[in-house]
């Protein structure tokens, strides 16, 4: 299980992405695409800067259950979002 600090950082990044998906057309389009492919709602996997990439991908596969998810990272104050499909990546 992740530390409290990592969980807080994930929550902060998820909150920022939630707001950004309402305002930023690129993020909104990514959420729409993921939801369409998943047949409804999509999952967002926020990634804290200190997290290991292998752990993040493992967590995404568990959450995805074969559906696409959005992996969100933050670098230099900017959000970066990427669609991840556990069947093809």
Please state what every model-predicted region is.
Residues 1-43:
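An N-terminal amphipathic alpha-helical segment
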Residues 7-9, 16, 48-50, 66, ...:
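Compositionally biased, intrinsically disordered low-complexity segments
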Residues 67-89:
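C-terminal edge-of-domain segments
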Residues 4, 13, 45, 70-72, ...:
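Weak global preference for isoleucine
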Residues 36-68:
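Short, hydrophobic/π-rich interface segment
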Residues 3, 20, 50, 67, ...:
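Generic serine detector
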């Amino acid at each position: 299980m992740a530390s409290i600090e990592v969980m807080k950082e994930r929550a902060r990044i998820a909150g920022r992405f939630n707001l950004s998906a309402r305002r930023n057309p690129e993020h909104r389009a990514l959420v729409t695409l993921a939801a369409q492919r998943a047949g409804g709602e999509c999952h967002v996997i926020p990634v804290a800067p200190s997290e290991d990439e292998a752990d993040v991908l493992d967590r995404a596969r568990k959450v995805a259950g074969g559906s696409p998810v959005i992996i969100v990272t933050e670098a230099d104050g900017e959000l970066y979002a990427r669609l991840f499909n556990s069947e093809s990546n």
